[in-house]
Amino acid sequence: MPKNKKVPLRKSVVSGDIIDKRNLLRIVKTKDGEIAIDPTGKKNGRGAYIKLDNQEALIAKKKKIFNHSFSMDVPESFYDELISYVDHKVKRRELGLE
């Protein structure tokens, strides 16, 4: 009898929903204090997750969610980069490319 693989679950910092890790995007703060999008989910550092959803990315910018999650000032340009990245990923998913 085949053994079922465990599906890792993570909590979105924006909505608080607990979702399958594959449907989330990881944002990481490295030891150097740099904030980056982590598409592979394997970068070293403190991670926070949001849903791959345009609305969540906009709420994250509006409420400056990552300023609280990482206890530092995250530049506005990072939030803009995040919104465009999420929009790109959502469109690819809708086209069936991912």
Language-model features: locations:
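C-terminal structural segments of small proteins and small subunits
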Residues: 64-94
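Short cysteine/histidine-rich zinc-coordinating motifs and their immediately flanking basic loops
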Residues: 24-29, 60-68
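Short metal-coordination and nucleic-acid-contact micro-motifs, chiefly zinc-binding Cys/His arrays
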Residues: 8-11, 44-47
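Flexible extramembrane loops and terminal tails that flank transmembrane helices
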Residues: 4-5, 96-97
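Short Cys/His-centered divalent metal-binding micro-motifs
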Residues: 50-63
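Short cysteine-rich clusters marking metal-coordination/redox-active sites
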Residues: 12-15, 51
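Short recognition patches in nucleic-acid-associated and regulatory proteins
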Residues: 20-37
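Cys/His-rich metal-chelating microdomains
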Residues: 18-21, 54
